[in-house]
């Protein structure tokens, strides 16, 4: 069965009232009103005004939050019903009522008929969501009007338009029903009288030919007023809350003429609740409070007036939200639901003198009406007209079976004690949620309405929240003044509880508020902060993005979620263009190579932006910052230490205050440099260094006799042998002093002991030994011929020199017991050599590896080789490595055997010679390299991004390094540069390509030699032929 949602409003057309104003006496109920107890009724629902033209008193509206008033009109309802005393006479008069066909002509005496119909018309704006209504009207008014094709009767039996057809059998009326009909007729007559007095109101936008009313064939219950129908007015302020109608709550109808907007809150109607109708043409803005109707609650009426002199606590300035009622129709089969525009929200409110009559009508018809109520306000996506500022809630009327069940409960008083939870699961959920909502509103107000709390309430309901709510067709009422067509928005009614978080609750375009919901605090979800993503990275949806959307909207993945525009600024086209730019920049960066020129050797920087910056030039700021650093200062002792008195020496040199150890080191250094005499003259007598020099000289036997003859004159010594002594004086010839005092001879013999220590193999003819001659400072005249040959041709003969030195060291130092192979390596750029030790099958072995790039002279090879052989001996013979005690023992043994060797040290201090120098043209930074492997045009400085030039380092005749600009590659380098790309393949390594290039270069170089040889041979043959001819 299809579910339809209607929005009820006053369908009485005041323009069609053709009766002249009549002076009828004011009718009111003679019975005394009685107050309802406060326990079952939260608020007093209504009371009639003492006079229809008097000021309206403040009353609480006992209406459903989701229902508007049924419009009631009848031509014959203005009869005086209150004075009828005889109930039987009235019953007989009412029983004679006949159903008039629609096409029948209007008779002189109109017959009264009650019609419950559902009429709709197309909206003015042409929207699909149009307003609907349930109308109770007089068929005598519309007898001359044709039926629109889109009309639908709510009754299960269709109206017979044939005048010759038999009339509908008249139902038997009981006394109770007669009383109820009497009350109905009285209220209708009062309302008609007031409309006649006040004149016609603003006509509706629909023509009379398009309006219709149809009879609803229903088993109408008795409509007799009781003492509870009229209640005294109340002036208590009405608050917005939830209204719960219990199982036996009777119909509450509010009829009003000038109330413009009725503010009603959410209401949960039970399955057993009877139909609640609300009829109004222009409702005053009022608030309806929470009301719990008990099982035996009588019909409540409300009579209100539009006069401004009444004492009211109603907030007239508050915007009133709209409501909609969901009515599943079961009467007519095959008929479409007609649509009718609502004029209740747009009728003119300028008629301030119009009075309002509110009466209570108990209508019990067999209308199957279901209730589908989301727990909170459902999202009104159909509110494409922006006049509404908040979402509307949907409610429905009870079904006809429920009305019959209510009649049965009224007859059986024991059924009132039936539990509320005895109905189906949907009813249990609604009752549970209503009570929970009521309690939470009392405790927390509106602050508890969050998605988590709503979801928890649903899960805690009787059915566990498993039943899906009905999805009615939301029909929207459009004002008369609405002429602009709005684009319909997607249906968001399925959002249910989350609608208040996804819809803007207020707009400033119109003060009208047709949702009939209380003004609430606007809840907005802020946009998620957008994080900046890399432009080259494509956007990927989150793995739980779809699930998050479904939590909010089960049908649409884009309307309800605020995640849809989280990355609105991210554009694929922009990312593509940016990625293209990045690729171009990468290609440009790939062509350039950045070099770090702050080190001695050039270092290639792959990415200068990401790598740590190289150390820059020294700046004055560094010194200032260094001076500002916190430093730990030595604390002064509490009691100063007493120091011995030291005699101050004025005008004494800085030297002379060394201790014994320092004196020994100074003297040993001077002894190696043959500077003992200079050292003795620099230090004063009595100093530790001077004393140490004297001790060394005494041990070496240097200057022992020279100390006794410093005062003798060398001239006398030279003249004594020349003078011939007389013949008689022979003994003086044998005098010892001339022989003893020979200071020049003694001074000439001083360097002899040092030569014997420094040069163990004394060179013949005054030349230096082999090891000493390998040094570049030794001249060619004093150098050994073989050593000089190796020194001058070291690059070509370094292997032979290494083998020669190895044999010499092994024989003198290691007794020919050391067997160590010697290799050369191009990978060692800073290390002069290394000894690689191995152990295999409990046998130790070593391999000495020498650097080609560091060992560029013969003297470096001499010192490095003995250093590494000492490591090998310590490992092979003693099983120890490193520069420990064993290594130092072997180094001292080598120094003792070869005095010409310098002191064997742990580390070298060789300045590495590079073949090329790279220099920046911008910042003048320079660094060195052993080879050139990149084009100079593609090189840039890492510090200043400036261009780099290349220099070639060469030595002149004096041995000084001269840097000259490097020219173009020549020979094999140029051949490789020109042909490397031609021979390169994907499956070949660079070494394989170089082998091919070497073969090709050798072939190319050998062709001219063969050509020259062939030409020479041809010439020789030609000469021989000439000789033979001669």
Swiss-Prot record:
Region (Disordered): 1-59, 196-245, 266-361, 375-433, 457-594, 699-764
GO molecular function, one term: DNA topoisomerase binding
Compartments where located: Cytoplasm; Chromosome
Database matches in InterPro entries: SprT-like_domain (IPR006640), SprT_Zn_ribbon (IPR035240)
Database matches in Pfam families: SprT-like, Zn_ribbon_SprT
Compositionally biased intervals (Low complexity): 720-748
A GO cellular-component term linked to this record: chromosome
Cytoplasm in keyword set: yes
Phenotype of the disrupted gene, per the record: Homozygous mutant females initially laid eggs but stopped after approximately one week. Many of the embryos derived from these eggs exhibited maternal-effect lethality. The few adults from F1 progeny of homozygous mutant females appear sickly and sub-fertile. Of these, 4% display bilateral gynandromorphism a rare phenotype caused by X chromosome loss during the early embryogenesis. By contrast, embryos from homozygous mutant females displayed X chromosome bridges and second chromosome missegregation and polyploidy.
A single BP term in Gene Ontology: protein-DNA covalent cross-linking repair
Annotated keywords: Chromosome, Cytoplasm
Residue spans of biased composition, Basic and acidic residues class: 20-33, 541-553, 578-594
Composition-biased stretches (Polar residues): 298-316, 329-349, 505-516
Range of residues in the leader sequence: none
Domain of life of the organism encoding this protein: Eukaryota
PANTHER family tied to this protein: GERM CELL NUCLEAR ACIDIC PROTEIN (PTHR23099:SF0), TRANSCRIPTIONAL REGULATOR (PTHR23099)
Main function: May play a role in DNA-protein cross-links (DPCs) clearance, ensuring the genomic stability by protecting germ cells and early embryos from various sources of damage. Limits replication stress and DNA double-strand breaks.
Family to which this protein belongs: Belongs to the serine-aspartate repeat-containing protein (SDr) family.
Protein's recorded name: Germ cell nuclear acidic protein
Source organism: Drosophila melanogaster
Species classification: Eukaryota, Metazoa, Ecdysozoa, Arthropoda, Hexapoda
Gene field: Gcna
């Amino acid at each position: 069965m299809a579910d339809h949602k209607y929005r009820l409003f006053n369908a009485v057309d005041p323009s069609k009232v053709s009766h002249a104003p009549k002076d009828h006496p004011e009718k009111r109920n003679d019975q005394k009103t009685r107050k309802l107890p406060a326990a079952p009724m939260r608020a007093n629902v209504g009371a009639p005004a003492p006079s229809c033209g008097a000021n309206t008193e403040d009353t609480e509206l006992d209406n459903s939050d989701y229902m508007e008033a049924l419009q009631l009109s009848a031509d014959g309802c203005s009869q005086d019903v209150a004075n009828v005393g005889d109930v039987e006479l009235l019953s007989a008069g009412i029983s004679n009522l006949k159903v008039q066909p629609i096409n029948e002509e209007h008779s002189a005496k109109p017959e009264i008929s009650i019609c419950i119909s559902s009429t709709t018309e197309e909206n003015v704006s042409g929207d699909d969501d149009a307003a609907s209504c349930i109308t109770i009207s007089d068929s005598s008014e519309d007898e001359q009007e044709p039926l629109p094709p889109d009309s639908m009767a709510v009754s299960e039996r269709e109206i017979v338009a044939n005048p010759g057809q038999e009339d509908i059998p008249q139902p038997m009326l009981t006394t109770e029903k007669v009383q109820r009909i009497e009350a109905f007729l009285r209220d209708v007559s009062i309302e008609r009288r007031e409309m006649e007095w006040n004149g016609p109101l603003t006509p509706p936008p629909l023509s009379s030919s398009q309006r219709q009313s149809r009879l609803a064939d229903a088993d109408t219950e008795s409509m007799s007023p009781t003492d509870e129908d009229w209640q005294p007015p109340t002036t208590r302020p009405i608050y917005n809350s939830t209204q719960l109608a219990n199982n036996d709550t009777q119909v509450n109808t509010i009829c009003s003429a000038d109330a413009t907007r009725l503010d009603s809150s959410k209401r949960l109607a039970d399955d057993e609740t009877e139909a609640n109708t609300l009829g109004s043409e222009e409702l005053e803005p009022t608030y309806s409070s929470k009301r719990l109707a008990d099982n035996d609650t009588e019909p409540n009426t409300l009579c209100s007036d539009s006069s401004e002199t009444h004492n009211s606590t109603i907030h007239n300035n508050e915007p009133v939200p709209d409501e909609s009622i969901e009515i599943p129709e079961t009467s007519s089969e095959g008929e479409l639901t007609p649509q009718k525009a609502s004029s209740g929200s747009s009728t003119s409110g300028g008629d301030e003198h119009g009075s309002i009559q509110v009466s209570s009508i108990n209508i019990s018809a067999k209308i199957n009406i279901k209730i589908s109520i989301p727990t909170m306000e459902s999202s009104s996506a159909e509110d494409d007209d922006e006049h509404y500022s908040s979402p509307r809630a949907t409610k429905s009327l009870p079904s006809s079976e429920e009305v019959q069940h209510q009649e049965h409960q009224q007859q059986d008083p024991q059924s009132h004690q039936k539990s509320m939870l005895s109905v189906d699961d949907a009813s249990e959920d609604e009752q549970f949620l209503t009570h929970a909502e009521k309690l939470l509103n009392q405790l927390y107000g509106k602050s508890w309405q969050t998605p988590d709390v709503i979801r928890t309430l649903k899960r805690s309901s009787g059915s566990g929240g498993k039943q899906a709510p009905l999805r009615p067709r939301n029909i929207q009422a459009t004002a008369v003044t609405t002429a602009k067509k709005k684009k319909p928005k997607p249906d968001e009614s399925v959002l249910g509880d989350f609608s208040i978080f996804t819809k803007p609750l207020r707009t400033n375009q119109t003060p009208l508020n047709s949702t009939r919901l209380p003004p609430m605090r606007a809840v907005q979800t802020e946009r998620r902060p957008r994080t900046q993503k890399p432009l080259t990275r494509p956007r990927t949806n989150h793995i739980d993005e779809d699930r998050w959307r479904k939590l909010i909207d089960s049908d649409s993945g884009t309307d309800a979620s605020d995640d849809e525009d989280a990355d609105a600024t991210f554009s694929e086209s922009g990312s593509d263009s940016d990625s293209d730019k990045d690729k171009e920049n990468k290609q440009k960066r790939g062509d350039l190579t950045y070099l770090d020129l702050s080190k001695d050797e050039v270092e290639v920087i792959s990415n200068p932006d990401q790598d740590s910056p190289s150390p820059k030039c020294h700046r004055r700021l560094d010194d200032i910052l260094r001076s500002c650093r916190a430093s730990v200062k030595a604390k002064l002792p509490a009691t100063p230490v007493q120091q011995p008195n030291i005699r101050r020496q004025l005008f004494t040199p800085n030297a002379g205050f060394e201790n014994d150890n320092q004196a020994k080191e100074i003297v040993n250094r001077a002894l190696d440099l043959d500077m003992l005499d200079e050292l003795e003259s620099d230090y004063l007598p009595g100093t530790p260094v001077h004393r140490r020099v004297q001790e060394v000289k005494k041990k070496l036997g240097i200057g022992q006799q020279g100390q006794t003859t410093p005062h003798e004159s060398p001239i006398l010594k030279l003249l004594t042998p020349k003078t011939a002594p007389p013949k008689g004086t022979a003994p003086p010839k044998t005098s010892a002093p001339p022989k003893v005092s020979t200071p020049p001879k003694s001074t000439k013999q001083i360097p002899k002991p040092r030569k014997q220590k420094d040069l163990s193999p004394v060179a013949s003819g005054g030349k230096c030994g082999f090891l000493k001659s390998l040094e570049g400072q030794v001249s060619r005249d004093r150098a050994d011929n073989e050593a000089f040959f190796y020194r001058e041709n070291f690059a070509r003969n370094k292997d032979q020199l290494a083998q020669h030195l190895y044999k010499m060291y092994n024989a003198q130092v290691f007794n020919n017991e050391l067997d160590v192979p010697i290799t050369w390596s191009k990978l060692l750029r800073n290390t002069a050599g290394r000894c690689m030790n191995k152990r295999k099958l409990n046998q130790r072995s070593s391999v000495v590896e020498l650097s080609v790039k560091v060992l560029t002279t013969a003297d470096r090879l001499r010192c490095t080789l003995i250093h590494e052989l000492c490591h090998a001996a310590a490992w092979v013979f003693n099983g120890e490595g490193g520069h420990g005690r064993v290594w130092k023992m072997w180094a001292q043994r080598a120094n003792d055997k070869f005095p010409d060797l310098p002191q064997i040290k742990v580390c070298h201090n060789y300045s590495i010679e590079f073949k090329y120098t790279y220099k920046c043209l911008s910042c003048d930074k320079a660094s060195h390299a052993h080879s050139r492997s990149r084009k100079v045009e593609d090189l840039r400085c890492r510090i200043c991004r400036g261009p780099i030039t290349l220099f070639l380092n060469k030595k002149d005749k004096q041995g000084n390094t001269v840097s000259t600009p490097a020219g173009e590659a020549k020979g094999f380098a140029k051949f490789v540069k020109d042909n490397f790309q031609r021979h390169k393949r994907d499956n070949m390594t660079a070494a394989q390509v170089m082998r091919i290039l070497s073969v090709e270069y050798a072939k190319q170089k050998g062709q001219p030699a063969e050509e020259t040889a062939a030409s020479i041979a041809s010439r020789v043959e030609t000469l021989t032929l000439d000789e033979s001819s001669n």
